Curated annotation (Swiss-Prot):
GO cellular component: cytoplasm; ribonucleoprotein complex; ribosome
Residues making up the signal peptide according to the UniProt record: none
GO BP field: translation
Protein name according to UniProt: Large ribosomal subunit protein bL21
Superkingdom field: Bacteria
InterPro entries: bL21-like, bL21-like_sf, Ribosomal_bL21, Ribosomal_bL21_CS
Family from the record: Belongs to the bacterial ribosomal protein bL21 family.
Single annotated GO MF: structural constituent of ribosome
The protein's role, per its UniProt record: This protein binds to 23S rRNA in the presence of protein L20.
Keyword vocabulary terms for this entry: Ribonucleoprotein, Ribosomal protein, RNA-binding, rRNA-binding
Keyword field contains RNA-binding: yes
């Protein structure tokens, strides 16, 4: 069973048992999350828009992504600024699509 689910304003096409990285969730590692905003459900042959479908997932861990370096400069003024940013992600495992 596959489903197109919206998690934190981003859409993911998920299957049972799949692990994926989503934007940081407000839960602790080991907690069970339920996503009720399912946009599409498919069983391989047919797809349906089921409003009663839910996706259950287990939060495995919180991690940070790769570092992105931001560099700003103004010419002839000796102005240079370097900043770094690491986006936070949560790793989840899809338990069921029902």
């Amino acid at each position: 069973m596959r489903a197109l689910v919206e998690i934190s304003d981003k859409q993911f096409f998920v299957t049972e048992g799949e692990k994926l990285f989503v934007p940081t969730q407000k839960a602790e590692a080991g907690d069970t999350l339920t996503f009720e905003k399912v946009l599409l459900q498919s069983d391989g042959a047919a797809a349906s828009l089921s409003p009663s479908c839910k996706v259950t997932a287990k939060l495995l861990r919180h991690i940070k992504g790769d570092k992105v370096t931001v560099f700003k400069k103004k010419r002839r003024k000796r102005y240079r600024v370097t900043r770094g940013h690491r986006q936070g992600f949560s790793e989840i495992e899809i338990l069921s699509v029902a």
